């Protein structure tokens, strides 16, 4: 499928993009959802974080009658020029191979999503190949980013176009009836780009946020950390704004995910975040548009060292602590299942009045 329509921000400059404003979720609805939870025949706050999260989802959707049965996972696939520096175990050909697997519904996230009735939507936003892949949405901005040790990863125009693509896809999904979306990605080298983005935005050292990715050796990890450190120093990224950081050391997948987070806030669609790649994009989005985080649902806390720092910076509390590092959106899809379970209680459980028991009071 082609991304034929011009993105929402297609002709915007960075300054014009910055003029957009995010409206907050509906606080009145949030209170109604919380009030309904208290009427259910269970201990007060018995579902813990899930009561807060469902109230957030209701506030985002603007209704206490919450319907998130139609779920989608946007999988942004892109290559990263920084792989030239030996920061990964595999080459860019793997991005294309996994994207094809996603199109056939064969990858990990696709199998998980299919098991719960969620739809996976692979998106070519920057694979380093001119091959057209049946089953993958062709939204290519360019054929991968540049090696950011030699030059900025993207141009300003490419960065805006990638953000715009993510935002527009959220709108299209909402128009097609999706009630909730999850972030997913595939791109060899994207734990390097996300580490660089995270270190710059949180003003911390490369070694604090750069992990082994798909399983680097000690030597490989040291090389990866040095690459991130060099980029931070070369471009003085600790003093750069979020857009400049994204453009300089980010990836097209991260930019697309950034747009997806922004789109969730603009179109009032709850966005379930996956791991560090998604959370790095979410932090960029929040820095560009304060308030975006109110539209984001955390899923899991992975084993990459940046995970805790990103969650803290976003003031989000992931509920799954399983040491996962698979990527693709797998943690977010797991969260879909937990949300469905919580919603089965919220929408169907007996109330105190129905079982003729006095309601607990706060």
Language model segments and positions:
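N-terminal loops that bind phosphate or other acidic moieties
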Residues: 1-362
């Amino acid at each position: 499928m082609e991304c034929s329509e011009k993105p929402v921000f297609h002709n915007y400059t960075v300054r014009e993009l910055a003029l957009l404003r995010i409206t907050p979720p509906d606080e009145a609805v949030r209170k109604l959802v919380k009030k309904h939870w208290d009427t259910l025949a269970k201990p007060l706050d018995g579902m813990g974080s899930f009561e807060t999260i469902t109230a957030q989802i209701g506030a985002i959707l603007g209704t206490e009658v919450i319907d998130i049965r139609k779920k989608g996972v946007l999988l942004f696939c892109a290559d990263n020029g920084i792989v030239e520096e030996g920061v990964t175990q595999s080459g860019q050909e793997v991005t294309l191979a996994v994207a094809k697997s996603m199109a056939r519904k064969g990858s990990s996230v696709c199998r998980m999503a299919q098991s719960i009735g969620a739809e996976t939507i692979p998106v070519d936003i920057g694979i380093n190949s001119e091959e057209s892949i049946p089953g993958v949405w062709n939204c290519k901005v360019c054929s991968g980013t540049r090696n950011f040790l030699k030059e900025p990863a993207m141009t300003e125009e490419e960065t805006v176009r990638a953000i715009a693509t993510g935002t527009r896809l959220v709108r299209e999904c909402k128009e097609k009836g999706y009630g909730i979306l999850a972030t997913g990605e595939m791109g060899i080298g994207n734990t390097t780009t996300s580490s660089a983005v995270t270190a710059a935005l949180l003003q911390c050292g490369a070694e604090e946020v750069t992990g082994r990715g798909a399983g680097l050796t000690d030597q490989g990890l040291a090389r990866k950390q040095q690459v991130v450190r060099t980029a931070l120093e070369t471009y003085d990224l600790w003093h750069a704004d979020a857009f400049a950081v994204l453009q300089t050391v980010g990836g097209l997948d991260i930019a697309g995910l950034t747009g997806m987070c922004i789109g969730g806030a603009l179109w009032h669609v709850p966005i379930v975040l996956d791991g560090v790649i998604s959370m790095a994009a979410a932090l960029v989005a929040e820095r560009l548009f304060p308030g975006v985080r109110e539209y984001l649902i955390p899923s899991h806390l992975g084993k990459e060292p940046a995970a805790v720092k990103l969650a803290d910076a976003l003031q989000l509390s992931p509920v799954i602590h399983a040491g996962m590092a698979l990527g693709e959106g797998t943690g977010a899809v797991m969260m879909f299942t937990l949300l469905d379970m919580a919603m089965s209680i919220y929408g169907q459980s007996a109330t105190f009045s129905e079982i003729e028991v006095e309601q607990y009071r706060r």
